Amino acid sequence: MSRRGVTVWFTGLSGAGKTTLSCGVAQQLRAWGLPVEVLDGDLVRQHLTKGLGFSKVDREENIRRIGFVAEMLTRHGVIVLVSAISPYRAARQEVRRYIGSFIEVFVDAPLEVCERRDVKGLYRKARAGLIQHFTGIDDPYEPPEQPEVVCKTAEQSIPECIDLVIQSLKSRGYV
């Protein structure tokens, strides 16, 4: 019998904790010997979607391409962990329909908290006008309406949030 794959899509503002959570979940799943791949938005932009900008059209195309790869891996029994801002609700809904086996994780942190966590200085640059189309500053972020999991990273610890995602995978029979 083949294993059922699933895509777990971590969405939220820059600095909310998407990469930290997806890597923490991956570490736990790998410790159990499960097939896992992490598709991190920053790394994907350096390779798979190099050349795309940050306009709405380019961001939607970025999400479609990540969704295409995630669907292929999911179809082959892999647990795919995507960490990408993916600011537009319609684009996330499109990849949800395309992939099928899909769990949306809203990594929810207030803008002020994300700005304080800004290790790359991106918010500072966006506020200074050096970066345009920056989600949360001069570009919108559309929160999910009904995500399967909500991680409030300003209130919950990283281990608590990782456990919420693992429990969601378990309750749906993926783990």
Curated annotation (Swiss-Prot):
GO MF annotations, alphabetized: adenylylsulfate kinase activity; ATP binding; sulfate adenylyltransferase (ATP) activity
UniProt keyword annotation of Nucleotide-binding present: yes
Protein keywords: ATP-binding, Kinase, Nucleotide-binding, Phosphoprotein, Transferase
Pathway assignment: Sulfur metabolism; hydrogen sulfide biosynthesis; sulfite from sulfate: step 2/3
Reaction catalysis annotation: adenosine 5'-phosphosulfate + ATP = 3'-phosphoadenylyl sulfate + ADP + H(+)
Entry-linked HAMAP family: Adenylyl_sulf_kinase
NCBIfam families: apsK, PRK00889.1, PRK03846.1
Family, as annotated: Belongs to the APS kinase family.
Function per UniProt: Catalyzes the synthesis of activated sulfate.
Protein name: Adenylyl-sulfate kinase
Organism: Synechococcus sp. (strain JA-2-3B'a(2-13)) (Cyanobacteria bacterium Yellowstone B-Prime)
